[in-house]
């Protein structure tokens, strides 16, 4: 920070850099420790942050700082493997219950997100995941990636579908 950031700021003043950004390593830092340290210094114009229905912790520890400092966010990991593959989701939920991050009484064994899947206003878990991220206060852009044109259209349609129903958002927050 003491060496690189001052030089980046000089280059920004010269017009050679338009925006300064920083990306967390969400897999290695799921509690956003680096961003909690970096954002209060107010050097960055944009951050790339992991945020999804399985780990929405950025809502409490990152977004308040980005909103306060007018920092844009690029949401990554909106749809993780676990949200697109039922077996992977069951495995992750079991791990979260075992670690104490999720209360076992709040989930159905083998069907943790049944209330999302069964809701008439939600086409799929993947759609719900994109809607969850895209309409979060503090989320600027939700990244999506695919090599399949049909999937890309579905992802864009999901992002544009509007926020999740209140009862779904409330239940996911539990």
Question: Which residue ranges define each predicted feature?
Answer:
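Glycine/proline-rich, positively charged
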Residues: 1-48, 52-61, 67-74, 135
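Structured C-terminal cap/extension of enzyme domains
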Residues: 41-43, 61-174
């Amino acid at each position: 920070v003491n060496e690189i950031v001052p030089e980046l700021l000089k280059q920004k003043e010269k017009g050679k850099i338009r925006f300064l950004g920083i990306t967390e390593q969400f897999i290695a830092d799921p509690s956003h420790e680096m961003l909690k340290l970096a954002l209060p210094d107010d050097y960055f114009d944009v951050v790339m942050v992991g945020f999804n229905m399985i780990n929405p912790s950025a809502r409490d520890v990152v977004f308040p700082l980005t909103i306060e400092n007018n920092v844009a966010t690029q949401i990554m990991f909106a749809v993780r493997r676990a949200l697109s593959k039922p077996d992977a989701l069951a495995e992750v939920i079991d791990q979260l219950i075992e670690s104490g991050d999720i209360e076992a009484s709040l989930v159905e064994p083998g069907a943790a997100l049944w209330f999302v899947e069964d809701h008439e206003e939600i086409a799929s878990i993947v759609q719900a995941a994109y809607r969850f991220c895209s309409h979060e206060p503090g989320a600027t852009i939700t990244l999506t990636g695919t090599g399949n044109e049909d999937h890309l259209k579905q992802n864009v349609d999901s992002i544009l579908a509007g926020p999740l129903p209140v009862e779904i958002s409330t239940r996911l927050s539990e």
